[in-house]
Amino acid sequence: MNFPTSRMVHLRNATLEVFEAGKRGRPIVLCHGWPEHAFSYRHQIPVLVDAGYHCIVPNQRGYGASSRPAAVAEYDIHALTGDLVALLDAFDYEDAIFVGHDWGAIVVWNLALLHPGRVKAIANLSVPFRAREKSDPVAFWEEQLGDDFYIVHFNRKPGVAEELMEADVEGFLTRMYRTEQWLDSQSTMPTKFWEPTDNAGLPGRPMLKADEMAVFVKAFERSGLLSPCHWYRNFTRNWERTGGVRQAISQPTLMIYGEYDSVPQVDMTRFVPQADIHILGCGHWIQQERPVETNQLLLAWLGALD
């Protein structure tokens, strides 16, 4: 597959590996999730370039060849959104359209809250906007879902899951990258999906071709999974540091859910009044599972912005 060649972009507080395509002028920044890579948008980049957009697709801090600071706090929401602001500055853009999937969506939502003037419009996949909780979210999940809920585990036992995932990167990613995992309402992923298994009986079907899987495996064998998991270890810090932030998204917004995603859909209309909401018949990895339909929705929505 013809994927753009990366270059290293040196920012104020980090260096990001950035994949770029298209002519300058109409910037659109594509933000990956966990555990992903800029390559997750391989199906969208050529279509967006053909439509006249300048695609800027970073491996965010902790991923690929981008900076991997040692301190957990260096992955908080202010650092992650600050990287995107600095990226716009590096390309000499005042604002851009931002697309986010999974954790990328969380970063884009917060970018719009913390730096609203830099966000022209938002297209997010899988993870909807959620207003700031009234209490520490990790403590809430621990009380409601127990110690084995992955976010709780990542926070309470740092390094344990990463060691297991890094011991067999391809096996771990094979467990994660599956399509329509929750097509059957009774389907569940293993509680501790980071632990080795023969993968027999897992819900859904393998999503990636061998050459596609090889890109992700190579990237995570290089970067490891400790830094990406540090994003999760900042939920409490993010909550503590955003108490005074107004919870409202004023930008035009496209929200795409996967019908069989484990991430629940929510009513965002109070906080995101301009949300245009769609549901595709797929699981969590929306733009990879349903690239044609995702691209159609993106292009129609982008066309309406012009």
Regions picked out by a protein language model, each given a short descriptive name:
Residues 44, 111, 297-301:
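Hydrophobic residues on the short alpha-helix immediately C-terminal to a glycine-rich phosphate/catalytic loop
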Residues 12-20:
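A short loop-to-beta-strand scaffold at the N-terminal edge of the catalytic core in hydrolase folds
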Residues 19-67, 87:
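Conserved HGGG/HGGXW glycine-rich cap/lid loop of the alpha/beta-hydrolase fold
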Residues 33, 76, 289-290:
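Active-site helix-initiating loop/hinge in glycosyltransferases
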Residues 275-306:
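Catalytic active-site module of serine/aspartate enzymes centered on a nucleophile-bearing elbow/loop
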Residues 6-8, 55-57, 255, 276-279:
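Conserved beta-strand scaffold positions in the cores of enzyme catalytic domains, especially
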Residues 2-5, 15-16, 27, 63-99, ...:
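Flexible "cap/lid" subdomain of the alpha/beta-hydrolase fold that forms the substrate-access gate
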